[in-house]
Amino acid sequence: MRSRVGDVDESVSTDEPSGLRSDQDVALRRALLYVILPLWFVPGIADWVWHRQTKIERTAGTFESLTHLLMKTSVGIPIILTLFFDINALVITSMMLGSVVHEGISFLDVQYADGRREVSPIEQHTHSLLEMMPFMATLVVVCLEPRQFASIFRLGSERPRWKLEAKRPAISLQYRVGLLCAVALFVIAPYTEEFVRCLRIDDTLKPHRTPES
């Protein structure tokens, strides 16, 4: 029977998301789970700080803040899928599309902010990191399941799997809870706060009252 990433390797802790084919797979998984994903929070929270320092609510305003929420969503959903479901054609495609959508919204974000809000060199470097992270994560996932990636383009002998399949064995509960808590604390909370702060000041989105005659 074919050995694949989803098969169980009893020599490896269940902290790993699924079975392993080689030491390279172990290294790739650990790079994704313990390096790429945790480090992703650093430029994310730094970018929020730069927005706050330049008073986004009084400059570029609600529209730019909305693009930030859309970018987080475009890559957040595929990442969540990789934590709970086997890596297959569906998950890989969602990550690729999410990365492309994130890049497109990022371009729109910078284009809109230009001339409305000061974007310092350090913020530009922060943006570069944020744009690179989704593609890095996607590349690691593709390397872990190259046959499913190839099957998307009708290459190789493996059929693409286009349904969500629960991970066997699952990533440890502690890791998933910890990462989701970090997402809530360092992504959802600050960027929701930013959006609400912009809404409170943006008069264009408030309902206009008809003057009483």
Task: Go through each PLM region and give its residues.
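Transit-peptide-like, low-complexity N-terminal presequences
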Residues: 1-26, 30, 196-213
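Transmembrane alpha-helical segments that form the membrane-embedded catalytic/substrate-channel core
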Residues: 41-50, 99-113, 182-197
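Membrane-proximal helix-loop-helix units in multi-pass membrane proteins
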Residues: 92-162
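Core segments of transmembrane alpha-helices
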Residues: 69-82, 129-139
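A hydrophobic membrane-anchoring alpha-helix module
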Residues: 166-213
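Helix-coil boundary and interhelical linker segments in multi-pass alpha-helical membrane proteins
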Residues: 9-34, 78-93, 140-159, 166-174
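Membrane-interface helix-loop junction between the first two transmembrane segments
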Residues: 45-65, 198-202
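Juxtamembrane helix-capping/reentrant segments at transmembrane boundaries
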Residues: 57-70, 120-125
